[in-house]
Amino acid sequence: MAISDWPEAERPREKLIEKGAAALSDAELLAIFLRTGITGVSAVELARKLLTHFGSLTKLCAASLHEFSELPGMGPAKFAQLQAVMEMAKRALAEELKNGDIMDSPQSVRNYLCLSLKGKPYEVFVGIFLDARHRTIVTEELFNGTLTQASVYPREVVKRALYHNAAAMIFAHNHPSGIAEPSTADEILTQSLKQALALVDVKVLDHFVIGSSEVVSFAERGLI
């Protein structure tokens, strides 16, 4: 049955307008994004198939063009639309971090980092460069690596901090395994970065590890 034949209160678009986006399931939200289904399959049914295929909304959003286009009804146009939505969300969160002391918006920091790093199939190491008032100067992807690790070089991080005239930094990296628990190597690296940056008067405020369902803060753990 086409969505247009459903009772009005059950149609995703009308439901969103009446009750707000938070009232919709992942499949219903995705159906609004898709707009139409394919022959014999409604947009909601197609959305459910996509979520089942990828396993989660996070993995769907992190899919490559090749992975995305393998499925019926999907292609470069839909992929481009999805990437545009993701990028707009990231930029909106990044704007929040530039407007004041980043330490006053810990949840915004977590949201931004999750959106940027969660679901990536390889490890990515990110640095947020801050001014003396802890306002964001720029966020950079400093290093990336394999499924299990990224090689991080403190000397290169110091160079970037000096280039941006940063007074403080926040680091983050993802664990493609989905487990956010910091490793011993993560702790050693964080201390190495902290010591190297201290030599040029740059303070390390935190280091976040991003998993599939959890974010661990080194500062909250007392590891900074």
UniProtKB/Swiss-Prot annotation:
<protein>
    <recommendedName>
        <fullName>UPF0758 protein NE1464</fullName>
    </recommendedName>
</protein>
<keyword id="KW-0479">Metal-binding</keyword>
<dbReference type="Pfam" id="PF04002">
    <property type="entry name" value="RadC"/>
</dbReference>
<comment type="similarity">
    <text>Belongs to the UPF0758 family.</text>
</comment>
<feature type="short sequence motif" description="JAMM motif">
    <location>
        <begin position="173"/>
        <end position="186"/>
    </location>
</feature>
<dbReference type="GO" id="GO:0006508">
    <property type="term" value="P:proteolysis"/>
</dbReference>
<dbReference type="InterPro" id="IPR001405">
    <property type="entry name" value="UPF0758"/>
</dbReference>
<dbReference type="InterPro" id="IPR025657">
    <property type="entry name" value="RadC_JAB"/>
</dbReference>
<dbReference type="InterPro" id="IPR010994">
    <property type="entry name" value="RuvA_2-like"/>
</dbReference>
<feature type="domain" description="MPN">
    <location>
        <begin position="102"/>
        <end position="224"/>
    </location>
</feature>
<keyword id="KW-0482">Metalloprotease</keyword>
<dbReference type="GO" id="GO:0008237">
    <property type="term" value="F:metallopeptidase activity"/>
</dbReference>
<keyword id="KW-0862">Zinc</keyword>
<feature type="binding site">
    <location>
        <position position="175"/>
    </location>
    <ligand>
        <name>Zn(2+)</name>
    </ligand>
</feature>
<dbReference type="InterPro" id="IPR046778">
    <property type="entry name" value="UPF0758_N"/>
</dbReference>
<dbReference type="Pfam" id="PF20582">
    <property type="entry name" value="UPF0758_N"/>
</dbReference>
<feature type="binding site">
    <location>
        <position position="186"/>
    </location>
    <ligand>
        <name>Zn(2+)</name>
    </ligand>
</feature>
<dbReference type="GO" id="GO:0046872">
    <property type="term" value="F:metal ion binding"/>
</dbReference>
<feature type="binding site">
    <location>
        <position position="173"/>
    </location>
    <ligand>
        <name>Zn(2+)</name>
    </ligand>
</feature>
<dbReference type="InterPro" id="IPR020891">
    <property type="entry name" value="UPF0758_CS"/>
</dbReference>
<keyword id="KW-0378">Hydrolase</keyword>
<keyword id="KW-0645">Protease</keyword>
<dbReference type="InterPro" id="IPR037518">
    <property type="entry name" value="MPN"/>
</dbReference>
